[in-house]
Amino acid sequence: MARITVEDCLEQIPNRFQLVLAATYRARMLSQGHAPKVDCKNKPAVTALREIAAGKIGLEMLKKVPL
């Protein structure tokens, strides 16, 4: 499987800071048992980035973060 890069994800979420926040929150969700939206047998952080690069996850992740 090809390596995932930040540039692949920046096409979906152009702001690097928002990208990191969305990927972090999604990785936490995956580690707590949520189902991945892409076929991936990697760690939660890599899976979250793959989901973002595939367009399955976007900025809506930031709206789900509890304050």
From Swiss-Prot:
SMART domains: RNA_pol_Rpb6. Its EC number is 2.7.7.6. It comes from Albidiferax ferrireducens (strain ATCC BAA-621 / DSM 15236 / T118). The lineage of its organism: Bacteria, Pseudomonadati, Pseudomonadota, Betaproteobacteria, Burkholderiales. This is DNA-directed RNA polymerase subunit omega. One of its GO terms (biological process) is DNA-templated transcription. Belongs to the RNA polymerase subunit omega family. GO terms for cellular component: DNA-directed RNA polymerase complex. The RNAP catalytic core consists of 2 alpha, 1 beta, 1 beta' and 1 omega subunit. When a sigma factor is associated with the core the holoenzyme is formed, which can initiate transcription. Coiled coil: none annotated. The gene is rpoZ. The keyword ATP-binding does not apply. Promotes RNA polymerase assembly. Latches the N- and C-terminal regions of the beta' subunit thereby facilitating its interaction with the beta and alpha subunits. It comes from the Bacteria.
